[in-house]
C-alpha cells in the first residue's frame, strides 16, 4: 500500500544554500520533517544551478514523517533579470522601460522553463516569457 500523503509544502529556497534557518526550518519543523536531511538533499540536487538563485521546491510530507521533493526551474522573472543584466524591473512598466530583451534571449529562458510552463511548443513558451518581460518593463525586440 502507498504511503498516505499528509501535506505539501511549497517554498522558494536559494540553490545550494538550504539551511535550518527561516523559511526552511519553521516550514518543515511544523510537519515533523527532518530538516537537516532535506537541506543536505536539496543542496546536492541544486549543484548545477547558480548558487543563490531562488529555486521553487514542492515537498511532499507523508504520514510517517518521511518526505520527497521536486525542484522546479527558477522563476522566469529572475532568469530574465540574469540574462539581461538588469538589477530589477520597472515600478511602472507601461511608462518606464528598464531594458531590452531579444528573441534569442527569450528562447533561452523559455528552454530553461519549458518543463514548468503550460505550453505545447517553443513559440508558445516564448510568448509566455515575453509577457513576463513586458510586465517587468523590458522591451521585447523581434
Curated annotation (Swiss-Prot):
Lineage top rank: taxon: Bacteria
SUPFAM superfamilies in the record: Ribosomal L11/L12e N-terminal domain, Ribosomal protein L11, C-terminal domain
Cellular compartments per GO CC: cytosolic large ribosomal subunit
Posttranslational modification: One or more lysine residues are methylated.
Keyword Ubl conjugation: no
GO MF annotation, one: structural constituent of ribosome
Pfam families from the UniProt entry: Ribosomal_L11, Ribosomal_L11_N
Record keyword Iron present: no
Transmembrane segments: none
Keyword set, alphabetical order: Methylation, Ribonucleoprotein, Ribosomal protein, RNA-binding, rRNA-binding
GO terms for biological process, alphabetical: translation
Functional description taken from the UniProt entry: Forms part of the ribosomal stalk which helps the ribosome interact with GTP-bound translation factors.
Family to which the UniProt record says this protein belongs: Belongs to the universal ribosomal protein uL11 family.
Assembly and interaction partners: Part of the ribosomal stalk of the 50S ribosomal subunit. Interacts with L10 and the large rRNA to form the base of the stalk. L10 forms an elongated spine to which L12 dimers bind in a sequential fashion forming a multimeric L10(L12)X complex.
Stored PANTHER family: 60S RIBOSOMAL PROTEIN L12, LARGE RIBOSOMAL SUBUNIT PROTEIN UL11M
The name this protein goes by in its record: Large ribosomal subunit protein uL11
Gene designation: rplK
Amino acid at each position: 500500500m502507498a504511503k498516505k500523503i499528509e501535506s505539501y509544502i511549497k517554498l522558494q529556497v536559494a540553490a545550494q544554500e538550504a539551511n535550518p534557518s527561516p523559511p526552511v526550518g519553521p516550514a518543515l519543523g511544523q510537519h515533523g520533517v527532518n530538516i537537516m536531511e532535506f537541506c543536505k538533499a536539496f543542496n546536492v540536487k541544486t549543484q548545477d544551478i547558480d548558487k543563490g538563485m531562488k529555486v521553487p521546491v514542492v515537498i511532499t510530507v507523508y504520514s510517517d514523517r518521511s518526505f520527497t521533493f521536486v525542484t522546479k526551474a527558477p522563476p522566469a522573472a529572475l532568469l530574465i533579470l540574469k540574462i539581461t543584466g538588469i538589477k530589477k524591473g520597472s515600478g511602472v512598466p507601461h511608462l518606464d522601460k528598464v531594458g531590452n530583451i531579444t528573441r534569442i534571449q527569450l528562447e533561452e529562458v523559455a528552454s530553461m522553463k519549458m518543463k514548468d510552463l503550460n505550453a505545447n511548443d517553443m513559440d508558445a513558451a516564448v510568448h509566455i516569457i515575453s509577457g513576463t518581460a513586458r510586465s517587468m518593463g523590458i522591451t521585447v525586440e523581434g
